[in-house]
Amino acid sequence: MSSPTPSTLRVGRRYRANRLDGPYDAIIIGSGIGGLTAAACLSKMGKKVIVLEQHYTAGGFTHSYDRNGYEWDVGVHYIGDMGAKHTLARRLFDYVTDSKLQWAAMDDHYDRLFIGNRQIDLVAGPEAVANELKSQFPGEDQAIDSYLDYLSPVAKAMPGVTLAKILPNLLARPFRHLARRKAPDFLNRTTREVLETLTGNQELIAALTGQWGDNGLVPDDSSFIIHALIARHYLYGGYY
């Protein structure tokens, strides 16, 4: 008998009342990536957890399916920040999966944008990104270098900005003060507003925001914080 393919593999058991072994410390409804992550973290804290799912298998957007001999993913296409084990994203994945989830690096040219007749490759590594953009947009070297220089300060400012927003008011005050002192002045502006301070070339702006779908808002409406975090996330390429 052949082994099941990823698209036919079933994870979990059918719900039956007589199979329950309660009481449970936590009941999680839905076995998508978020539900499974919460379940794994609670379980690691010694909690007794049950995950309930109406589909025949757990996994949500981690599912895949077959059509005409080809296998397709339903959700996650590729993600970044998996190449080095010290990154926060990699440490989180290793924690919730006990380091069992293995990652494969995609090609250095991991994606491609088409803007009119122009083809722009999304490449791995800051130097490669700069070289690709400068070859496509001669005369825009300073704007491209400034844009890449903006990405790191945003990432460094985010812990303070986040804590200032989620902590109770009394505890948040020092973090708000720190955020005002340390955060770059462009942090609370839209993506388009920031990019138009660097260049008036609309095709370059389109290239820099080509992955706007990952944050769900067009550059006119999206926060530059989110844009910069996503751009930095993929700065060293994609992983699967």
Please annotate each region the language model reported:
Residues H86, K182-T191, Y234-Y240:
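Short beta-strand to alpha-helix junction loop
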Residues D221-L235:
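Residues forming anionic-ligand binding surfaces in small-molecule and nucleic-acid pockets
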Residues M1-I27, K44-M45:
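Extreme N-terminal leader/targeting segments of oxidoreductases
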Residues P23, R176-H177, G210-Q211, R232-Y240:
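Glycine- and acidic
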